[in-house]
């Protein structure tokens, strides 16, 4: 498959480029940066042996290169518009950018289906993180008192993380509604109890040195249960990205969540 990478200078995009180069059945045909200084990726020392054009305009890249799939790891500000542009050009998309609303996902799914092409948006491409979400969903049926703590590097732009939101959405499907905390609790400092989704509290930590981590903490009388996943390196996401790129060939719709393509 001929693959282009959008956001290739970001930490995740850089790792995706290296992954595409490692995979025998994937070919890196173009990369995209919002303000490129280079015309070819070989102007970067690490990739000096390659011949891959660098683009600053997504539509131009799609029309000139015609990739089979674009992997997008950019920012919430442009993630939706990028994905829409990719799909409207009839190109498959694998998107790790977060911040999509349910309405945006629905619209993008309609475009993918009208074009009969596959696409996948996932808040997390680590298989361990997907298992964490599935385990939490099962546990929430029996432990409705639950809070989420997500921890990421301090350059992450959105909060709470897409993984935390997806976890809460999945737990809400099996969990009896409980508004977490005392009915008359008072925040002495605004935001001390975190954000709220369906009565569950979500807390976001941003610190240097972290990559991506999440704890789902359940409490009940006389017992507690904690489900935690840690990504210590961005390589943890790459097997999921490569799997998703290949899977788009089999799809004619947009899938939200890596768990929906795992056997």
Curated annotation (Swiss-Prot):
Family of the protein in this entry: Belongs to the DapB family.
Protein name as it appears in the record: 4-hydroxy-tetrahydrodipicolinate reductase
Pathway participation: Amino-acid biosynthesis; L-lysine biosynthesis via DAP pathway; (S)-tetrahydrodipicolinate from L-aspartate: step 4/4
GO-annotated biological processes: diaminopimelate biosynthetic process; lysine biosynthetic process via diaminopimelate
Species this chain originates from: Listeria monocytogenes serotype 4a (strain HCC23)
Coiled-coil blocks: none
InterPro entries to which the protein is assigned, alphabetical: DapB_C, DapB_N, DapB_N_CS, DHDPR_bac, NAD(P)-bd_dom_sf
Top-level taxonomic group: Bacteria
Reaction catalysed by this enzyme: (S)-2,3,4,5-tetrahydrodipicolinate + NAD(+) + H2O = (2S,4S)-4-hydroxy-2,3,4,5-tetrahydrodipicolinate + NADH + H(+); (S)-2,3,4,5-tetrahydrodipicolinate + NADP(+) + H2O = (2S,4S)-4-hydroxy-2,3,4,5-tetrahydrodipicolinate + NADPH + H(+)
Residues where NAD(+) binds: 7-12, 96-98, 122-125
Compartment(s) where it occurs, according to its Swiss-Prot or TrEMBL record: Cytoplasm
Positions of (S)-2,3,4,5-tetrahydrodipicolinate binding: 153, 162-163
Chief location: cytoplasm
GO molecular function, one term: NAD binding
Catalytic site: 152 (proton donor/acceptor), 156 (proton donor)
GO CC terms: cytosol
Keywords of this entry: Amino-acid biosynthesis, Cytoplasm, Diaminopimelate biosynthesis, Lysine biosynthesis, NAD, NADP, Oxidoreductase
Pfam families in alphabetical order: DapB_C (PF05173), DapB_N (PF01113)
Function summary: Catalyzes the conversion of 4-hydroxy-tetrahydrodipicolinate (HTPA) to tetrahydrodipicolinate.
EC code: 1.17.1.8
HAMAP family per the UniProt record, alphabetical: DapB
């Amino acid at each position: 498959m001929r693959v282009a990478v959008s956001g290739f200078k970001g930490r995740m995009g850089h790792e995706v480029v290296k992954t595409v180069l490692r995979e025998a059945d994937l070919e890196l045909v173009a990369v995209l940066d919002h303000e490129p200084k280079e015309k070819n990726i070989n102007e970067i020392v690490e990739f000096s042996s390659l011949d891959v054009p660098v683009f600053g305009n997504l539509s131009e890249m799609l029309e000139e290169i015609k990739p089979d799939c674009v992997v997008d790891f950019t920012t919430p500000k442009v993630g939706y518009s990028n994905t829409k542009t990719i799909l409207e050009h009839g190109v498959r998309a694998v998107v790790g950018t977060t911040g999509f609303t349910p309405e945006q996902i629905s619209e993008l799914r309609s475009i993918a289906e009208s074009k009969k092409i596959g696409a996948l948006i996932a808040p997390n491409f680590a298989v361990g993180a997907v298992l964490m979400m599935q385990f939490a969903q099962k546990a929430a049926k029996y432990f409705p008192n639950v809070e989420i703590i997500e921890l990421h590097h301090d350059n992450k732009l959105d909060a709470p993380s897409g993984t935390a939101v997806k976890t809460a959405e999945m737990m809400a499907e099996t969990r009896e509604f409980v508004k977490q905390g005392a009915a008359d609790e008072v925040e002495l400092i605004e935001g001390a109890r975190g954000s709220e989704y369906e009565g569950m509290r979500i807390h976001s930590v941003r610190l240097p040195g972290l990559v991506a981590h999440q704890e789902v903490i359940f409490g009940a009388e006389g017992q507690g249960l904690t489900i935690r996943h840690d990504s210590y390196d961005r390589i943890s996401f790459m097997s999921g990205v490569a799997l998703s790129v290949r899977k788009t060939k089999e799809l004619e719709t947009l899938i939200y969540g890596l768990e929906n393509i795992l056997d």
